[in-house]
Structures are given as C-alpha cells and as structure tokens.
C-alpha cells in the first residue's frame, strides 16, 4: 500500500510539474498579447473620442489601432492552434481573424461589420461543437436565451427602431444565443470569453440602437470585448 501511495504521489507531482512547465512556456505569448491589446486599446480610445475633420465618428487611423488590438488576440489564437492544430483550435483561430476584419469594417459600415461578426460567431460555434458536443445544459441555455431574444430583445428593437428593419439585429442576437449556449460545456476560460462577448455586444446595442452616450460606457463596452477575445484566444493554450 505504501509503495502504491508513493507511486501515486510521484505521478501527481510529475503531472503538476508538467502542467506548471506548460503554463510557464506560455507566459510570454500570453503577456505579449495582453500588453499589445492594452496598448492598442489605449491608442484607439485616444483617437476614438477626438473630433475629426471628416465628420465620421471614427477616423481610419483609429480603426487601424482598433483592429490591431483584436489582431493581438488573433495572433495568440493562431499560436495556440499552431501548437495544437486540432479542428476546434483552428476554428477558434479562424473566428478571431474574422472578428479582426469585422472590427475594422464595423466602423466603416455597421451592418456589413455585424454580418462579418456573425460569421466569426459561426466559426466559434462550430469549434465548440467539435470540442464538446452540446448536451442538455446547452439545450436549456439555448431555449432560455431564445426566449429572451424573442420576448425581450425583439420588442426592445421595435421600440427603438420604429419603422426601421429589426430582422438583421434579431438574427444576430439569435446567433449570439446559439454561440453562448454551445459555450456552456466548454472550458471555463472559453465560457467566460463567450459571456463577455455577449455582454459587450449588449452594451454596443445600447449605444447604437438606444443611443446610450458616455465615454466611460463606450470604453467599458470595448474593454469587455477585448477581454472576451483574449480569453477565447487563451483557451487554445488551456489544458
């Protein structure tokens, strides 16, 4: 019994040491991605809230920095997919690249940008299905989120977009509902990223549709988005 216990302890110690070594190996790319995102986020917000001669809300220069911040997360996801080239990881990396493009497009044409983001969520959703097939928790989550979209989001859209199309926004909300429901059985870091993405988009809807104003509000919305993308990318390095 003592010998078996010692073998068990030795096995646990080796597993823990291997896990620690793996995390240490990833500290540098994780840190570089995070620092890069913070830096470009700060530069972008500095440009974002400055008036520009074109009359647009965002200058093209500001959009470059906005995209670069997301690109830092995409690079981290690509690194994780390179280390572990599984279909789920490769789809996450693809989704991050798509979202990087969507980030820039959103500032030029909101509707097209929203559609491209939808494609990014499709890539995320496919990754989740391959990584951990949906079960009862995902089904319950989807039904609850769908009910919220139909009974809460759609009436809200009709109120603030009187006389204007609500279908594109409702469809995007359903895509988010599917993505978040499929994230329920995934790694905690991935679920957290999916949740923060939805929270950020909810705040963005408040700003774009209900015209909620304020620099702090906009900065928190964007910060949640970048944190979401960072966590999704970091999940490719999680055990």
Kindly label every feature range from the protein language model.
Residues 9-22:
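Short, Lys/Arg-enriched N-terminal segments with co-localized hydrophobic residues
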Residues 23-239:
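Polytopic alpha-helical membrane-helix bundles and their juxtamembrane interface segments
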